[in-house]
């Protein structure tokens, strides 16, 4: 092949003409000190709060403290190779994580990188972890239910799509169990779930993943794992990363449910980072902005209107509202709900489910305290039939707890009080429910109907659970049409009432338990 010198010179001239020698304006700084994952940098003049900083070895950090002559940053990930004198660069970007359908069924870390050994995640979409929550005009009121499948919650403290409902209690009271049951019950409803595990043992997270897989719920769930062995910075950003993944679905007119398990450990991680950054400590040694830490996270859980979704998707999705429902978990110490972080989160959320150690140890599981648990906005979202039938249950339980305490001292009780006590005993038994056994709306309605209409009055309190099991088996085998009808509409009228009464009369006449 003959090379023509003129062709070569022409090619070189063309390349020189098209070469762009624009200088890249990137501020560089120097690592002054490094300890406990906190880096002090000198020379980064125009760095922004929350900006990503690039270190050698493809490692990134987050600028948190902007001081007069230095910048305090936390390193995200391993920092053993970083040393004093190393160069650090501004990136001009804030931290973003991968989002999208590709993450469903996967376990990722706080940066959205796969940690489940199933290979890289195939998504090109990213979203910043910090976002401003939708404003008042962009929101819509909460009026659609999130069914957890737990009688005690759906009847007494209903949760609506776009609500923030706190699950609070001491350690080992079944907080995670309630959250996992809620995820399992979303199977087939189209609600996408995100489970954010902060500061937990890797074995506990693996157990949750296994349980979700066994019940076919992993395929609609993203698990964000920031284990106890990871740095405080990774634990601190995990809930924000999970929230960004949930917002992807909300902003596209879908419904998502996010569980933060738990925000106490996130507050501990943030306290650790703040103290290492030499920020002044306040109450319980937390920094001054620990309320803002949780409020800016939980305000992002909302129900957005159809105009917002249409605008966000550039008209691709029309007439659909989106929602992100949050179930934050807070762990209390010896039932003290008046500590700093619990009171903060109670004031931010739209209600709380209070789990009690004494009830849990007495075998009442889920161990929900009916008197202290409340849902401030869920009532408007509750299914009609459950709202109608469940109204008396909460009252019966609250009265029963009061009377039970009083009756220990009184020997002769009048007939009315004795009846209330007997009914309360049976309703308490009825509210018991095993883990991984969520109930449909119709099944729940039958249980509540049986309690309200006196079908349990002649059943021994110890046999109530057996009665319910036998009743549900009978309904599932011979009354499938009625169950389907109730599940489809959720209405409560004379026709439905007559059908339920006839079904229960038939069951009591022909079956034993």
Swiss-Prot record:
It is a peripheral membrane protein. One of its GO terms (cellular component) is proton-transporting ATP synthase complex. Pfam families: ATP-synt_ab, ATP-synt_ab_C, ATP-synt_ab_N. InterPro entries: ATP_synth_asu-like_sf, ATP_synth_asu_C, ATP_synth_asu_C_sf, ATP_synth_F1_a_nt-bd_dom, ATP_synth_F1_asu, ATPase_a/bsu_AS, ATPase_F1/V1/A1_a/bsu_N, ATPase_F1/V1/A1_a/bsu_N_sf. SUPFAM superfamilies: C-terminal domain of alpha and beta subunits of F1 ATP synthase (SSF47917), N-terminal domain of alpha and beta subunits of F1 ATP synthase (SSF50615), P-loop containing nucleoside triphosphate hydrolases (SSF52540). Signal peptide: none annotated. It is an enzyme of class 7 (translocase). Its EC number is 7.1.2.2. The record marks 373 as: Required for activity. It catalyses: ATP + H2O + 4 H(+)(in) = ADP + phosphate + 5 H(+)(out). It is found in: Cell inner membrane. Keywords: ATP synthesis, ATP-binding, Cell inner membrane, Cell membrane, CF(1), Hydrogen ion transport, Ion transport, Membrane, Nucleotide-binding, Translocase, Transport. GO terms for molecular function: ADP binding; ATP binding; proton-transporting ATP synthase activity, rotational mechanism. ATP binds at residues 169-176. NCBIfam families: atpA, PRK13343.1. HAMAP family: ATP_synth_alpha_bact. F-type ATPases have 2 components, CF(1) - the catalytic core - and CF(0) - the membrane proton channel. CF(1) has five subunits: alpha(3), beta(3), gamma(1), delta(1), epsilon(1). CF(0) has three main subunits: a(1), b(2) and c(9-12). The alpha and beta chains form an alternating ring which encloses part of the gamma chain. CF(1) is attached to CF(0) by a central stalk formed by the gamma and epsilon chains, while a peripheral stalk is formed by the delta and b chains. Belongs to the ATPase alpha/beta chains family. Produces ATP from ADP in the presence of a proton gradient across the membrane. The alpha chain is a regulatory subunit. This is ATP synthase subunit alpha. The gene is atpA.
